[in-house]
């Protein structure tokens, strides 16, 4: 693409681990964890889609192939798979949160596309600019940061505290994750 003066998009994955169950809400539309994550990541320019866990593959599967079975390991509840991507019913389930997002090719091209001069209405080529042929690696870091903001906010809502030490203490006494 770079040699041709073009650009490419791509798909990246973010995995958040070590989170407790119960972040988010199963009742309030604006507090559901998957909705908050999606809103924050999709607010970044050029991101065009997001999936959590198995995501769009679920459309081709039966419920018995999608839903994660629950077990007991002698100390805590576990899931035998993580097709839900760490979020069920709007809340975290203590499994890794797995997110994939797609970014479109960036629009600035060294080999410009056809356009129209808005003053003269004449056909023109778009302005040539210095550009990267692929911004997906950099954009994935931005998306990871957006996810961190959402998770930090959800942790504060659930556990509170004036300091990190207080919040860690609240997390430690609330359950075995």
Regions found by a protein language model. Give the residues of each.
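Glycine-rich anion/phosphate-binding loop at the beta-strand->alpha-helix junction
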Residues: 3-122
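Internal helix-turn-beta structural module
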Residues: 108-177
